[in-house]
Regions:
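Acidic (Asp/Glu-rich) sequence patches and key acidic residues
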Residues: 1-159
Length: 159
């Protein structure tokens, strides 16, 4: 199952270095791959979170169509740009990395984050709280995943 959040803004970031500075300013331990400028990304973006590999999809979208899709009544402003962050898979870092990257991008561009699952808009400050909550939960998720993997390995040996 894939999850999606969107950011809306009136300007874009010109480089990965600018985006990375915004991420660093939030104090996130996320490092983006820097081989392609954000304006040319339309697909999977690789990175590292706390030294571990992570990825999420990053797609530019038509802002007006995306606001219409999300429910135009939710927006008090016609944004110029929209980007989707999509993640899924088995890597527990992906959701946290996507929220961190989206939060930093939204704050750096004066934008907002939209979580379609909740149907809710988040200011950059509120999105920061979500990203921090997800980050604090990572050690427990890692522990649970390791426990589950050990259990599965034991069950395989017994059969």
């Amino acid at each position: 199952m894939s999850m999606v959040i969107r950011i809306f803004s009136d300007r874009t970031l010109d480089s990965v270095a600018e985006w990375q500075r915004a991420i660093d300013a939030e104090g996130f331990a996320l490092r983006l791959s820097d081989d392609v400028p954000p304006s040319e990304i339309n697909g999977v973006w690789l990175g590292r979170l706390h030294g571990e590999q992570t990825d999420f999809e990053f797609h530019p979208r038509d802002a007006q169509e995306t606001m219409e899709f999300c429910g135009p009544e939710k927006f008090d402003h016609k944004w110029k740009y929209a980007f989707e962050f999509i993640w899924g898979g088995r890597n527990i870092n992906n959701s946290t990395a996507a929220w961190m990257a989206a939060t930093a991008y939204a704050r750096a561009t004066g934008g907002i984050v939209y979580d379609g699952e909740e149907g809710k808009l988040f200011s950059p400050a509120a999105a920061l709280d979500v990203a921090r909550d997800l980050e604090q939960f990572l050690p427990e998720l890692r522990e649970r995943k390791q426990h589950l993997m050990r259990r599965l390995a034991t069950q395989r040996k017994q059969t």
